[in-house]
Each structure stands twice: as C-alpha cells, then as structure tokens.
C-alpha cells in the first residue's frame, strides 16, 4: 500500500481556518493554533447571538410600544390586553413600526384598546 503524505490536506485545512480568521488581531490571524481557537469561539458567539438577536428585537419593540402607549395614557400591558380583547391581531414588530412612523394610527389603536377594556 502506498504511503499517504498529508501535506496537501493539512495545508488546505490550515488555509481554510486562516481565511476565516482574516481581520483578527495579532496571532489570531497568523498562527494556526491560535486562529483555530478564535474561529471556533467566533462560531460559538455567532450561534448564541443569532438566538439572542430575536430576544433583543422583541425587547426593543416592547420598549417602543410601551413608550408610545404611555404617551397616549395607557401602559404596555393594558394596551396589549385591550388589543387582545378587541381582537386586533397585529404583532409587536408591526405595532412598534406604527408607533414610530404613524403616530395617528397608533393613537387610533390605543383608543380601540381603551374601548375594549
């Protein structure tokens, strides 16, 4: 059986990792062993933060809706409860968008929520 030298495979693997670590500071972009650890850690952060991003956007939407609802004399929880009772099915993303860009329409939604309470 022929002897297999792994130089080509190893170089390709190292090249792949160093390419992924491009732009990292110092040894993290130059030394394979350090770069590999940095790339793995970056992937872990990316995985975690893809899930966190969803939570953070929901928090942002709720904060915006709460601020706009309070300007119209209603707390966030009462506003959402009123919308549910009035059977208005608009999600928080759209509500936050309306609160920021169309204050008149949001005031109408608040009035509808108040009447349902």
From Swiss-Prot:
GO molecular function: rRNA binding; structural constituent of ribosome
Superkingdom, natural source: Bacteria
Lineage of origin: Bacteria, Pseudomonadati, Pseudomonadota, Gammaproteobacteria, Pasteurellales
Record GO biological process: ribosomal large subunit assembly; translation
Function: Binds directly to 23S ribosomal RNA and is necessary for the in vitro assembly process of the 50S ribosomal subunit. It is not involved in the protein synthesizing functions of that subunit.
InterPro entries given in the database record: Ribosomal_bL20 (IPR005813), RIBOSOMAL_L20_CS (IPR049946), Ribosomal_protein_bL20_C (IPR035566)
rRNA-binding keyword on record: yes
Stated name of the protein: Large ribosomal subunit protein bL20
Keywords: Ribonucleoprotein, Ribosomal protein, RNA-binding, rRNA-binding
Family, similarity comment: Belongs to the bacterial ribosomal protein bL20 family.
Gene Ontology CC: ribonucleoprotein complex; ribosome
HAMAP family: Ribosomal_bL20
């Amino acid at each position: 059986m022929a002897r297999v030298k792994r130089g080509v495979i190893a170089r390709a693997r190292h090249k792949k990792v160093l390419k992924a670590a491009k732009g990292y500071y110092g040894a993290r972009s130059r030394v394979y062993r350090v770069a590999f650890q940095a790339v793995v850690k970056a992937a872990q952060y990316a995985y975690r933060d893809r899930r966190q991003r969803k939570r953070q956007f929901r928090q942002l939407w709720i904060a915006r809706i709460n601020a706009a609802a309070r300007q119209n004399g209603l707390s966030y929880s009462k506003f959402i409860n009123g919308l549910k009772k009035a059977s208005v099915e608009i999600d928080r993303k759209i509500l936050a968008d309306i609160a920021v860009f169309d204050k008149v329409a949001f005031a109408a939604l608040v009035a509808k929520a108040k009447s349902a309470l």
